[in-house]
């Protein structure tokens, strides 16, 4: 018997009917660990359920998701009630979840949180230790697998933004056994042998076990002790590793890390223009301040001009001289008037004026005025003072 040749669609439809009509596959209870968890804006929840060997894609529609009494998390162990369905267009199958209950936190997830808590308590995540990335680096070191999307994305972004930057790649294992040691060797290489301005630790997205190399205690301390600033760019935006918390900066993706560390040429030009403008403004301010100081100094000097001061003092001296002359003249005039009055009195009392009226004054040899005859003796020499002179006379006869 010859079988009919089927189209791809017919094959998918046939498998879909087999699966959907199977009693067991319509009433599954499956346990595993949640990974690749995504909450869609529509309200649907997409994730994978995995164990040590396998994984299966799952979806929980909004009408069932609203009934959950806890929030799903990466690494969480759960047990789901679901039916297996076939996506006809792609020929893939997935579990359609009706209900989810906790089955315990995944061991790796639990180990991650334990290490994160320990390192946080040891202080190596503290913001005070975070260093700023260089604004205009010249050489960029990258530690990642030598092939893959991560290294391509980082290099493409850096070269697109600024072709003048030097890029040095340290090819390292980023997954599996000894991966953490390989990354540690890369950090030491750049710190000891190559002078770079910043280091990117990069890896593409994956499950928690695929990113586990970046959840290593020794690697955390190597990053912490690096003298060169580090950027952690591991996985997708929803993925977090210990290296994210200890690095100086976390980038949500490798491409974003390339953006963070590489200033574009236009940014550099804009920065130079801004600095030029800043310098111009600073010089203008300095000039205006200096001009203001000079103006103030000029006004001060003008107010204290020696010539002006001398002229002012001359005016003051002239004024004082005039005042002294006035006061002196007034005092002299007053004294003159007083002298005239006194002279008039003296003239009135002057004996010589009396002589002018025919009187005379007799004085002895000691020029003492003789008022009485009894003061004379015979042969005394006396001086007779008259209006126009004096004569000496010997007393010969005294008549009393």
Curated annotation (Swiss-Prot):
Its main location: cytoplasm. CDD domains: ExoVII_LU_OBF. One of its GO terms (cellular component) is cytoplasm. Pfam families: Exonuc_VII_L, tRNA_anti_2. InterPro entries: Exonuc_VII_L (IPR003753), Exonuc_VII_lsu_C (IPR020579), OB-fold_nuc-bd_dom (IPR025824). GO terms for biological process: DNA catabolic process. Keywords: Cytoplasm, Exonuclease, Hydrolase, Nuclease. GO terms for molecular function: exodeoxyribonuclease VII activity; nucleic acid binding. Its EC number is 3.1.11.6. It is found in: Cytoplasm. It catalyses: Exonucleolytic cleavage in either 5'- to 3'- or 3'- to 5'-direction to yield nucleoside 5'-phosphates. It comes from the Bacteria. The keyword Zinc-finger does not apply. Heterooligomer composed of large and small subunits. Bidirectionally degrades single-stranded DNA into large acid-insoluble oligonucleotides, which are then degraded further into small acid-soluble oligonucleotides. PANTHER family: EXODEOXYRIBONUCLEASE 7 LARGE SUBUNIT. Belongs to the XseA family. This is Exodeoxyribonuclease 7 large subunit. It comes from Clostridium perfringens (strain SM101 / Type A).
